[in-house]
């Protein structure tokens, strides 16, 4: 695909992702939304399924010749690998969505020959979108420099903490180390 086509696609996906935010947040803010579980035990919500439906409707309308692999409908049975496909996760971080931590995203990517070509990640809870095209130089953003605190910063999933993770945190605590967990 040519660069101008990719820029048009990324713009369309950004608009689509932004249009999903109010729908997803309406469910997120509902105190009584239901959660069910897939065969693998992972949770799925009405927001997952609504996002899935709206994203697939858009992609099938505008890009009908490109197959779609979505977390909410993918099964390996009968799957034929494609050189080009959409990779979709309507709510990445469903456990965080259910726990109302705000740490969940909507992800849409175009994959060609096993490599990501472009992608959009939207964070409805903070009203932000990140996007990129792999053939272009990434946009740079100046980072704010801060004085480091005395706390160790540890990147660890809040939803998937293991016994080993807990033992490690206990070890640090017993040895007087301050810890800040970043999820």
Residues of each region from the PLM?
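Conserved protein kinase catalytic core
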Residues: 77-78, 95-98, 129
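Glycine-rich active-site/cofactor-binding loop and its immediate structural neighborhood
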Residues: 82-124
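Flexible, active-site-adjacent loop/turn segments at secondary-structure boundaries
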Residues: 31-33, 42, 95-96, 102, ...
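Acidic beta-strand-loop-alpha-helix segment within the catalytic core
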Residues: 108-183
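N-terminal subdomain of lithium-sensitive/metallo-dependent phosphomonoesterases centered on the IMPase/IPPase/PAP
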Residues: 1-91, 162-178
